[in-house]
């Protein structure tokens, strides 16, 4: 009888682990990851551009991921993303230059200049309004 109870508890723990993994943003992102060099090229191109700045260990970044994915998919947007937690992307001078001191942050660039930003966790409707407001995609 004890074996059945232990087996049952192990199965419950496994099911909970799988649920947590699936519900915490394991879905494939609809944004395109870039590095610091590509970020600079995107800004310098002077074309209208949305760039999402995040960290993989940031809880609000994990929370916003499904919301952002939903809007990108629905609106058929092209969004670049920079994970500043990756060693190659962490540069304090760069972060200071672009005033990137909070994640998640979605930036809108036009003519090589930042025109708007959305910082912190936001709902899908708030994200959609941000993209619509900066609509020349």
Curated annotation (Swiss-Prot):
Signal peptide stretch: 1-25
Superkingdom classification of source: Bacteria
Pfam families to which the protein is assigned, alphabetical: Thioredoxin
Annotated keywords: Disulfide bond, Oxidoreductase, Redox-active center, Secreted, Signal
GO biological process: cell redox homeostasis
Function of the protein: Unknown; dispensable for production of the lantibiotic sublancin 168 and for competence for DNA uptake.
Name recorded for this polypeptide: SPbeta prophage-derived disulfide bond formation protein A
Species, as recorded: Bacillus subtilis (strain 168)
Gene name of the record: bdbA
